[in-house]
């Protein structure tokens, strides 16, 4: 990880720091020519950070490109407003970077760290860049009044940390919807079965394989580079209006975004054709494709079910049961289910309300069911 990176030449004039007392004075004076960059994991930043600071994260794929000089610092910002703010002000403002506790900075070894790499890159781009002695911990201990703290514990997650490189085990995403998405995505743990009883809240840590090339997941899955690489995922279908496509600038993935909120008023079915075409394109190129929304239980599930219906000539019930067998906590909203029923009629498939006796078993209840094997046959068609 960080220790394996090739050391970046770190000239003595780069080892420039600012004290926490100096920063406090600038904040007290209301210095508008000060740009603070918080280099800690996003969940730590969201929990508490120095006022006016913006969060910067470095996934491994971007870290390598940054080190080679092929990626500008502005590409590291996942939020458009932060990227614009940095671009406007980095050439004129005093830029101060901080991590959790850089108290033993050494100019001879500093270039081996991510903080040193960022300082060098900012210098190369013409910025007046410094690091904060003692980091956030020291500043918070001495000048807590200039720290913004989120007392809402809803951002905490029991999911395992994402293995993304950065300062202090830096991660680039949180499953909190407070800043990213204010629409009506539901907590995966609140999903219910058809009888209204709650489903088990033990959802998979990684995206679920629906077909040998098709994976269903949540927003957090789309930020886990190790998992994307493990499953050969190169295509990412983002079924949200405003969750960022984090690695779009890196050039390693192909994205498609469907701007739909999880709300009864939304017409997701109008995007079925292009979503299905995108998934087929990935399959045709022998690439994995991840379909995700925020929680991974409603919008992305609806698109996945629609794909199975069209490509395997399955009724909505059949396709839904396949997905539910793989991922038990799915819970599309009723409007999306109605759109799937309309899609079923458009495809001329057997309705679940049909009184005709089906020639095959209707529901996929066990892995030994012959219709499940038909799903696997799609890989070779």
Curated annotation (Swiss-Prot):
Keyword Hydrolase: yes
Biased composition (Polar residues): 189-203
Superkingdom, taxonomy of origin: Eukaryota
Localisation per UniProt entry: Cytoplasm
Main localization (coarse): cytoplasm
InterPro entries: Dual-sp_phosphatase_cat-dom, MKP, Prot-tyrosine_phosphatase-like, Rhodanese-like_dom, Rhodanese-like_dom_sf, Tyr_Pase_dom, TYR_PHOSPHATASE_DUAL_dom
Pfam families from the UniProt entry: DSPc, Rhodanese
Catalyzed reactions per annotation: O-phospho-L-tyrosyl-[protein] + H2O = L-tyrosyl-[protein] + phosphate; O-phospho-L-seryl-[protein] + H2O = L-seryl-[protein] + phosphate; O-phospho-L-threonyl-[protein] + H2O = L-threonyl-[protein] + phosphate
Listed Gene3D superfamilies: Protein tyrosine phosphatase superfamily (3.90.190.10), Rhodanese-like domain (3.40.250.10)
Keywords: Cytoplasm, Hydrolase, Protein phosphatase, Ubl conjugation
Class of the enzyme per the UniProt entry, highest EC level: hydrolase
Domain Rhodanese: 30-148
GO biological process, one term: signal transduction
GO MF terms, alphabetically ordered: MAP kinase tyrosine phosphatase activity; MAP kinase tyrosine/serine/threonine phosphatase activity; protein serine/threonine phosphatase activity; protein tyrosine/threonine phosphatase activity
Gene Ontology CC entries for this record: cytoplasm; cytosol; nucleoplasm
PTM annotation: Ubiquitinated by the SCF(FBXO31) complex, leading to its proteasomal degradation.
Job description of the protein: Dual specificity protein phosphatase, which mediates dephosphorylation and inactivation of MAP kinases. Has a specificity for the ERK family. Plays an important role in alleviating chronic postoperative pain. Necessary for the normal dephosphorylation of the long-lasting phosphorylated forms of spinal MAPK1/3 and MAP kinase p38 induced by peripheral surgery, which drives the resolution of acute postoperative allodynia. Also important for dephosphorylation of MAPK1/3 in local wound tissue, which further contributes to resolution of acute pain.
Assembly and oligomerization: Interacts with MAPK1/ERK2.
Family indicated by similarity: Belongs to the protein-tyrosine phosphatase family. Non-receptor class dual specificity subfamily.
Protein name: Dual specificity protein phosphatase 6
Organism: Bos taurus
